Amino acid sequence: DIDVHDWRLGPTEVEQHRVPVTSAVRTWLDIARLRPLSDGLAVGDALLRSRVGISAEIRTSIDARGSIRGIRRARLAADHIDGARETPLESGSWAYFVEHRVALPAMQHEIRSRDGRFVGRVDFWWRHAGVVGECDGRLKYTDRADLYAEKRREDALRELGFTVVRWGWQDLRGEALAQRLRRVLA
């Protein structure tokens, strides 16, 4: 799909080295304003992982735009971008939590056994409820050895008394995942 939008570009946003471009921040801002929150978070999270100090540039860019269409959505995305999320599915999951008012978890949390042995690093961690959240794409465990290792890791988490909730892209549609999370977080 191609979306065409008319919005004036600044001189550094139009051309660099004789190639027509928009800056990384400008591109993010357009995505954050005009696309779903999950898209703005996925691109923003990647920007934060790739460039130190970009967060201030993002805020300055938003503030300079005043009240253009979609700016509130961009502000919401800016409030939630975080370089700790490592995949678009993790970013999409965070957007889902925000949109469905699910309690926001810690991210990329290390879990250790009672004797201090490393058990694993989990995508999402709701400490107050002892709940681990794992989001998995279809291609994550195509190798049998990886699948078996993940099963053993999940068994170890459950043996420590944690509830493990898993989801994929398809679960980010509708209310079922939010209801399931609210139930285990209560």
What are these regions (language model features)?
Residues E110-V119, W126-A186:
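Basic, glycine-rich
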Residues D1-A106:
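Phosphate-handling catalytic interfaces
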Residues S93-Y96, H100-H109, G120-F124, G130-V132:
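Conserved active-site beta-strand-loop modules that form the wall/rim of enzyme catalytic pockets
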Residues D1-V4, E15-P20, L89, G120-R121, ...:
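Surface-exposed beta-strand edges and their flanking turn/coil or helix-capping segments
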Residues G66-S67, R75, R117-V119, F124-W126:
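Short acidic, glycine/proline-enriched helix-loop-strand junctions
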